[in-house]
Amino acid sequence: MEDSKEGTAVQVAQVPRLTSDKVFSALGTSAAGLSAQEAEARQQRYGKNVIQSGKKKSKVLVFLSNFTHMMAILLWVAGVIAFVAGMPELGVAVWLVNVINGCFSYWQESKADKATEALKKMLPSYVSVIRDGQEQKVLAEDLVPGDVLMLEEGDKVPADGRVVRSSDLQVDQSTLTGESNPVRKTADAVLEENLTNAEMPNLVFEGTSVSEGNGRVVVTQTGMATEFGKIASLTQNMEQKESPLQRQLDHLTKQITVFALCMGVTFFLLDVLFVHNGLAASFIFALGMVVAFIPEGLLPTVTLSLAMAVQRMSKRNALVKSLSSVEALGSTSVICTDKTGTLTQNEMTVNHLWTPACEYEVTGVGYAPKGEVRADGKAYAAADDEDLRLLLEGGALCSNARLLPPEEDGGRYTVLGDPTEACLLVSAQKAGLDPKEVERRMPRVRELPFESRRKRMSTIHQLEEPIDGATRVAFTKGAPNEVVRLSTKVRVNGEVVPMTDSLRSTIMNANDSYAADGLRVLAVAYRPIHRDEPGVPASMSQYTPDDIEKDLTFVGLEVMQDPPRPEVAAAVAECRRAGIRVIMITGDYGLTAVSIARKIGIVKGAHPKVFSGLELEKTSDEELRRALKGEVVFARMAPEQKLRVVENLQAMGEVVAVTGDGVNDSPALKKADIGVAMGITGTDVAKEAADMILTDDNFASIVHAVEEGRAVYANIRKFMLYILNSNVPEAVPSAVYLLSGGAVPLPLTTMQILTIDLGTDMLPALGLGSEPPEKDVMGRPPRDPHEHLLNKEVMRKAFMWYGILGAAASLAAFVFAQVQAGWHMGAVMFGVGKDLDPTYVRATTMALAAIVFTQIGEVMNCRTELASVFSVGLFSNRQVNKGILFEVALIVFLTVFPPFQGVFHTCPLGLADYGFLVLLPPVVLALEEGRKAIVRRHLGIDRDGVRIEQENVER
């Protein structure tokens, strides 16, 4: 053994290969356990059997981080500038927006990372051990290497150990491997090479649980040296990841800062050179314009948009823990998914029955006894065929599982015991047998439990009606090769005939064919037991496997699998259409994994690369990355291996989503760009490590979430386009004022500009954030995570098209008001040198209102990228409709009520003014609809925004 401050690190590779006696010797203990003194000495040496917590960020720092990211800092600075520029009310308003946004973000993401605490909750408090030759109860944290543990059904395993005594000991290792089938444990030495620790039949692991039987275990590892501890260490040491959206918002902040400062400097110079104001006055004016060019409403709009997306996703069975994770889903390029329970139903189902005379198909999936046994186009009952009846009765009787009916209407059947045995009961019921009635007619009198060495189990039953002249019968089920080897006879068409090489070959060919498809196969045979049979013990308790499991009569094969979820194939196809690769990483065997992967469309080629955990250990990162470019399936993976796959995909530039439900998945879940945990079967550890939880454990829900994530990013671009385009009509009138040397009075005041940024723009922008996904959102390739939010296309559309339209409308409205009052070309404009001139006030009010009314058309235009807005329904977005009503009501409010007229430099407008304003939205809408139609025709896109060739393929 090696000393360690984190526990003990016994050479586990050697322990499974030792006999029980040698295990005691190697670990310095005995069947009587450690003495109290030795246990205390070892605890001093190895420490407590606890999962240590890593350093965690304090809640105060987490809270403050919501106020110190780049966009928040920009708003703090904007508030300071507003105070310096003599606008304290504005400064307070900007700071208040920042505070509210930060508090809201913290509240949304207030669930701290509790992965380590969740691990601790999975461990028992007290355990039974043998010390000083006596059974004792001790605290689990006081266990040391060499302690002899006593495990019984229902116990949680408190440390890693080597089994030294087993009485049908079965352990649920799903928390570590992800596979739900109980694993039978043996005390025998393992000589087979190329097995991972999790595959060792004589090792048990901390955090797993005993599902059946009992046994004794010598502790080999404690604390952080256990498999559990290693997973905790991997999880703790993971660096906090930054989402693509966080990176893009930081970059956008830099762009906005540079733009605002450049505009401030430009306006300062223009004011000095053309208007000839003093330096101080020009500086204050420039500061006001800097504040005006910072989109104060962008950050809260992004936050609220993400929060609304979280609510929408929860209705589609996806609970998102982190707001920024919503958008990251949209750039996902690879989904690494578990198999059991995510792609499959996690309910073993018999789908074929085979006898030498007939092959039957079994319909229905899951544990619900709904379905039929069919052959040659018709349904069969057990009563119709004696061979079929014996096959089904033998499978049902040679089983310890129990089916529990749903507790409520519409509920699911549940299983007590081995799921593989449970599906045998279901297949019997589908053929009209009642397992309870069968058991009443043939009560069990003896069981010879399954052993991994024998690969079979047998049960002996008393008969009401003789079988082959005997009043007792033994049913044996197990690995087909073993059962066939022990069979000397076969039932064919109701007759018992001798086993021949030809029949043996026929049986094994059928088995091999099913196994090649990744199906699990169990053989069923029986042996009549005559009371006067020579060589059979007189007492039932003296029966041994050697006495019973010989001269068997082979009956048939029961073929089963955990079937794919019915909606998964369509979801995988949708991923392919969206340019997203799906890679299966499972703890199951390679053949089974490939079979399921092929059925649901994850792999299409004839020879996909299949990596086992042991093969992956021998593969370099360079070789792995080459393999990851093609079709690949990973089977029998350990936690650190799954993590390695994720890390290599990320190194290749992929944005990776990972699904998982067990403790073993937590490192990969935390490392992934998006960790997706299962809500039903998932452990607390997996849920805490993940960014998103699926409440229905369904892969299809991930695809819905990706669609929503793509829509969120598209919507952020839409409302960013909407918010930023108003900067042009805010800037151009001011530029006209400056370039005219003051001959054209300032069409918009700073407070009017802030009215647009923090008032009229906010709610319509928020409405754009709730826009449903466009029809072609899953027909596009994944977004490049390095692509900037504010790219050239957005800037061109915002500043060179929408912005110019708004600026033209604003200036036109300003001039319209001047002309209405009698101004003409060559005359001095109303308001020059007279800020309170009534005509000038009316003109600035019109300029402000024109921007607002133009934005009504713009918000409709922004709802779709290329599709006609009429294809989605002009008024179908209620949030946008409410936003439009709000901004119109606000502008009326600011112009009608005297207390606000002085602050915002406004006045009431007349019917002619409103007649001019209401023409603006339809004009803007018509111009953009025309532009979109021209672009669609050029790109071969229909009115709904879908490429015409793609539409034809889908049809």
Predicted regions and their residues:
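Membrane-helix interface motif
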Residues: L811-V828, V896-Q901
